[in-house]
C-alpha cells in the first residue's frame, strides 16, 4: 500500500507540471540576464557557480510561487479521494489511522521531490562552474549565513545544505496542503490557499 501510494505521489501529471513550471521560471530568469551565463560558459574560471546560484535564488520569482508547487503534486490527493468515494473503499481494507500515516509519508516525499528536482536542475550544472572557478570566495557571501558554512566546510556543503532546505520546504508546504484538504472541500482553494499563506508569511 505505501509503495503504491509513493509511486502515485511521484509519478503523476501534477508532479510533472509542478517541476516543469518551476524549472521554466528559474531558467527564464537566467535568460533574462540575472546571471552572466555566456561569460560563465566562455570563461568559467572567472565565475563562481555557487555565488551565481545564490544570487539567482535570491532574486528569482520562483520563490513567489514556490509555496504552491509542493501541494500541487499530491498534497490535495486526500480531498480527491474523499470526493470520488475511494476513501470509503480504502476504509474497508485498512484502518484509517494507518492509511493517514501512509498518506503523510507519501505527501511529504512528493513535496520533497517537487522542490528538489528544480533545485538540482540549477545546482548540478552550476557546481561545475564552482569547480573550474579561480574565484573561491565572493564578496556576495560577506553578509550571508553561507559565508560561515563555506569557511567551516567548503563550498560543496552549501550546495548540500541548500538542497536539504529545499527538501524541508517542499515537505512543509505539501503537508500544509494535506492538512487543508482535511477541512476544505474545494480543491481549488486547497491549491491556492498555501500560496496565499506563503505570501502573507513572506
Name each region found by the language model.
Residues 1-22:
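Aromatic- and glycine-rich beta-strand/loop motifs that create alpha-glucan
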Residues 16-19, 160, 164, 168, ...:
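Hydrophobic alpha-helical transmembrane segments
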Residues 25-77, 101, 105-174, 178, ...:
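Secretory targeting signals
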Residues 18-23, 187-201:
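Central hydrophobic cores of alpha-helical transmembrane segments
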Residues 90-96:
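Short helix-to-coil transition segments within interhelical loops
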Residues 71-90:
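Transmembrane helix boundary and interhelical loop/hinge segments in multi-pass membrane proteins
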Residues 93, 183-184:
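Helix-loop interface residues and adjacent transmembrane-helix termini in multi-pass membrane transporters
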